[in-house]
C-alpha cells in the first residue's frame, strides 16, 4: 500500500495577491495519508513555537531513559503486555469518555503491565505530548510514545515529554528515513519499536538490520479490520532471520482476551500491545489482569 506525503504546493505572491494553485494530487486517498498530511502541518507549527535548539537544551537536564526492550525481554508475564493509553481513534471515535491518564496509568501498573504506550496525536486520537508528560510523572514503567513520526523533531519532542521508546511505522517511511530516525533515537537513548503490516515490510526491516524490536499490526490499513492471523502470515517466511537477529516480536491490535494472547504467542509474539479492549472496560486494572489470565 503506497502512502504518499503531502505534495508541495507553495503559495505564490503577485503584487498584493497571494494564492496557491490546486495540486492534482492535493487530496489524501485514505485515512493514513490524511493523518500524515496533517502531521506535516503540525510539526511545522510546533517547530515555530518551540525551536529544536530549545528541545535539545531541555534534554540535557533529563534523567536517563529506561530500558524498554530490556523490560519486555525480562518480563515475568508471557507474553509481556504493553498497555496503551488511548482516548479515541479515527475508526472508532471516542473510546473512553471518562479519560484520566493518571488514573489509567496507575491501573495499568497495578494490573501488571510491563510497559505503557501513550498516544500523542491530538487531531485524530485526542492525545497529546502533555498526556505523556502526565503519565511519566505518575509511573516508573518504560513508556512508548505512540506517534506518527515523520521528522526527527518529533523524536526530540518524545524525549522531552518522558518517552523511553518511539514508534516508527515502516509503511510511511523509506529505508533512508528509518535509518536516519533510528540514528537520532539511539543518540537520545530511546528504544525503537518499528511497526510492519505485511511480509514485505518485515523483510525490509530485517534487511536493514539493527531493529531488535518489531511490532506486527494486525489491522489492515485499507479496511481497518483486524485479523490475528496477520501475525502468523507476516512471520512465517522470516522465522530463521528473526531468530538470527534476536528480534523480539510484538503483536498489535485485535487482542481482546487471554485466548487471543495465547494465539499470537503460538505465532512467535513475545509481547502484545493492547489498547482499545482495555480502554472500554470500567475497571481497567481488573481487565488487564483478566486478559493475562491472572486469578
Swiss-Prot record:
InterPro entries (alphabetical): Aldolase_TIM, Indole-3-glycerol_P_synth, Indole-3-glycerol_P_synth_dom, Indole-3-GlycerolPSynthase_CS, RibuloseP-bd_barrel
Q: Which UniProt keywords apply?
A: Amino-acid biosynthesis, Aromatic amino acid biosynthesis, Decarboxylase, Lyase, Tryptophan biosynthesis
Q: Which PROSITE patterns match?
A: IGPS
One short Pfam name that applies is IGPS
Q: Which GO terms describe its molecular function?
A: indole-3-glycerol-phosphate synthase activity; phosphoribosylanthranilate isomerase activity
Checking PANTHER family in the record gives: INDOLE-3-GLYCEROL-PHOSPHATE SYNTHASE (PTHR22854:SF2), TRYPTOPHAN BIOSYNTHESIS PROTEIN (PTHR22854)
Which EC class, in a word?
Answer: lyase
Q: What family does this chain come from, according to its entry?
A: Belongs to the TrpC family.
Output the superkingdom of the source species: Bacteria
What CDD domains would the database entry show?
IGPS
Which biological processes are named by the entry's GO terms? L-tryptophan biosynthetic process
**Protein name, please?**
Indole-3-glycerol phosphate synthase
Could you tell me which pathway this protein works in? Amino-acid biosynthesis; L-tryptophan biosynthesis; L-tryptophan from chorismate: step 4/5
The EC code for this enzyme is 4.1.1.48
Which reaction is this enzyme known to catalyze? 1-(2-carboxyphenylamino)-1-deoxy-D-ribulose 5-phosphate + H(+) = (1S,2R)-1-C-(indol-3-yl)glycerol 3-phosphate + CO2 + H2O
Amino acid at each position: 500500500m503506497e502512502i504518499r506525503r503531502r505534495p508541495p504546493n507553495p503559495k505564490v505572491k503577485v503584487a498584493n495577491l497571494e494564492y496557491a494553485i490546486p495540486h492534482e494530487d492535493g487530496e489524501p486517498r485514505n485515512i493514513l495519508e490524511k493523518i500524515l498530511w496533517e502531521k506535516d502541518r503540525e510539526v511545522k507549527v510546533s517547530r515555530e513555537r518551540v525551536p529544536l535548539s530549545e528541545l535539545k537544551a531541555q534534554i540535557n537536564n533529563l534523567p536517563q531513559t529506561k530500558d524498554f526492550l530490556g523490560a519486555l525481554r525480562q518480563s515475568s508475564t508471557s507474553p509481556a503486555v504493553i498497555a496503551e493509553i488511548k482516548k479515541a481513534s479515527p475508526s472508532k471515535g471516542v473510546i473512553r469518555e471518562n479519560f484520566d491518564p493518571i488514573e489509567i496509568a496507575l491501573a495499568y501498573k497495578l494490573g501488571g503491565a510491563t510497559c505503557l504506550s501513550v498516544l500523542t496525536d491530538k487531531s485524530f486520537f485526542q492525545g497529546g505530548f502533555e498526556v505523556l508528560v502526565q503519565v511519566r510523572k505518575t509511573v516508573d514503567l518504560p513508556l512508548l510514545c505512540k506517534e506518527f513520526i515523520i521528522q526527527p523533531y518529533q523524536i526530540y519532542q518524545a524525549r522531552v515529554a518522558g518517552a523511553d521508546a518511539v514508534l516508527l511505522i515502516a509503511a510511511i517511511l523509506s529505508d533512508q528515513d528509518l535509518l536516519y530516525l533510528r540514528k537520532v533515537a539511539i543518540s537520545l537513548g530511546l528504544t525503537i519499536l518499528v511497526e510492519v503490516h505485511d511480509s514485505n515490510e518485515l523483510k525490509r526491516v530485517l534487511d536493514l538490520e539493527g531493529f531488535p524490536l518489531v511490532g506486527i499490526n494486525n489491522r489492515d490499513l485499507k479496511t481497518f479490520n483486524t485479523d490475528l492471523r496477520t501475525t502468523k502470515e507476516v512471520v512465517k517466511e522470516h522465522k530463521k532471520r528473526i531468530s538470527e537477529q534476536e528480534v523480539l516480536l510484538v503483536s498489535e491490535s485485535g487482542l481482546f482476551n487471554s485466548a487471543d494472547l495465547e494465539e499470537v504467542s503460538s505465532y512467535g509474539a513475545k509481547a502484545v500491545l493492547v489498547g482499545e479492549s482495555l480502554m472500554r472496560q470500567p475497571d481497567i486494572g481488573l481487565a488487564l489482569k483478566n486478559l493475562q489470565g491472572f486469578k
